[in-house]
Design a protein with these regions (language model features):
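Nucleotide-activated donor-binding/catalytic signature segment of Leloir-type glycosyltransferases, i.e.
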Residues: 251-269
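Short alpha-helical donor nucleotide-sugar binding micro-motif in glycosyltransferases
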Residues: 98, 268-269, 276-281, 372
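A short, active-site helix/loop in glycosyltransferases that binds the activated sugar's phosphate group
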Residues: 54, 138, 150-195
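Aromatic "clamp/platform" in nucleotide-sugar-dependent glycosyltransferases that forms part
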Residues: 289
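Conserved acidic donor-binding segment of nucleotide-sugar-dependent glycosyltransferases
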Residues: 321, 325-332, 341-347
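Short hydrophobic beta-strand element within catalytic cores of glycosyltransferases
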Residues: 306-309
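A short, well-ordered alpha-helix in the C-terminal region of glycosyltransferases
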Residues: 341, 348-362, 371-374
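A conserved mid-protein helix/loop that constitutes part of the nucleotide-sugar donor-binding site
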Residues: 192, 205-228, 245-251, 333
Length: 387
């Protein structure tokens, strides 16, 4: 079978990549894993002409190729307004790939994923939708539409997966919508990263947060908590990893609180550097307001790091076994207290680290691939001719 993946994920040319393209984040890992389920896989994605980017990774996989689209211009309303002209230019490619596909995968949110999803429905193609946002919270009309669509069409040859996890199914109205976790860690990486931690020296507390530098992730609260943490741990530091529109304002916030020398902004780094920074840290702080299934939290757990986070989405399930602490109210004072509670008791810290490793071991990329493969085979039959 041929899989066609329609995604908004921006890719770019790479002379060192077997497919000729690279991208960043967890996308290349997950596409490589999905390609192992099919005879051929085509990624239908926007491509930039810029070849020099930080944190890029080659797109590779079993008989994996890329069909480039032009990159939609603008953001927000401007992007929506320009999308009609983008469609006119890219419709021949979109329709050609839909017609030749045996199964269509649409990761959403995202406008290109949505277009692929609707075209697959129009051409009566088996559809595999993976919702990567917060399934429980719909703030926009698009989010309400995606949820309605998945509940309406989850049955038969259509596989609908919501990224996250809970004891109950995503919806009581349609049991065919199922949970799926998200990861970019291979089993060998989980083994390589696995190291039970001991509490750091009494005055040290190396905190880290890895995420997009945007509002809603709680980065400003972590920065504001650091002066309070330093009262108990005078040598405390904070590593902030990731890029985004709020990066400059967060840097200014560190200056305002007179802790710029204690905060290191790494920007966007590659996967290996993220894991290295996590291995060098003592505690992962992630007071986010909304999530699907945060891969960075899983990576922290895989490195044996206890996690301080919020009661949002799947996070209570990941942390509730004792691999960290959940804060009810996100304030600098609450975060500083949670940091103290994690680091002040050597036995508790050691236990949290052990629990973190146990939790992470359940979420390998191989298990993610096999879970999806089982669901697709149950809906559509054999996926590979050599199966």
């Amino acid at each position: 079978m041929k899989l066609a993946v329609f995604s908004y994920k921006l890719c770019w040319p790479s002379v060192s990549s077997p497919t000729g393209y690279a991208t960043d984040g967890g996308f290349p890992f997950q596409m490589h894993a999905l390609s192992e389920l099919f005879d051929t896989t085509t990624l239908v994605v926007p491509c930039s002409s810029t070849t020099t980017r930080v944190g890029g990774m080659s797109l590779t996989g079993r008989n994996l190729s890329l069909r480039p689209l032009t990159n939609p211009v603008g953001n927000g309303l401007w992007r929506k307004a320009a999308l009609l002209f983008w469609l006119v230019r890219n419709t021949p490619v979109l329709i050609s790939e839909i017609r030749h596909a045996d199964i269509v995968h649409a990761p959403i949110p995202g406008d290109i994923g949505t277009i692929g999803m609707l075209l697959a429905l129009l051409w009566r193609k088996p559809l595999f939708v993976r919702y990567c946002g917060n399934w429980f919270v719909q703030r926009t009309s698009a989010e309400h539409f995606w949820r309605w669509f998945m509940l309406r069409f989850a049955a038969g040859r259509n596989v609908m997966l919501a990224t996250g996890g809970a004891d109950e199914q995503p919806s009581p109205h349609n049991p065919n919508v199922r949970w799926i976790f998200s990861t970019s860690l291979l089993e060998q990486e989980l083994t390589a990263c696995s190291r039970r931690r001991e509490r750091p020296a009494s005055e040290r507390a190396r905190l880290i947060i890895v995420c997009r530098q945007e509002k809603g992730k709680g980065i400003e609260k972590v920065i504001e908590s650091l002066p309070l943490v330093m009262k108990s741990f005078p040598n405390a530091t904070l590593d902030i990893v990731g890029d985004g529109t709020e990066l400059t304002s967060f840097k200014q916030l560190a200056i305002t609180h007179k802790i710029a020398s204690r905060v290191t902004f790494h920007g966007k780094v590659d996967h290996e550097k993220v894991l290295l920074l996590l291995q060098q840290s003592d505690l992962f702080c992630y007071p986010t307001a909304s999530e699907g299934f945060p891969k960075a939290v899983l990576e922290a757990l895989a490195c044996g790091l206890p996690v301080v986070t919020t009661c949002v989405s799947v996070l209570p399930k990941l942390i509730g076994n004792g691999s960290g602490l959940l804060v009810e109210k996100v304030t600098p004072e609450a975060l500083a207290q949670a940091v103290f509670d994690c680091l002040s008791d050597a036995e508790r810290y050691r236990s949290m680290s052990t629990r973190a490793l146990e939790t992470a071991s359940q979420y390998s990329l191989e298990r993610w691939r096999d879970t999806i493969g089982d669901l697709l085979r149950a809906a559509c039959g054999p996926l590979r001719s050599d199966a």
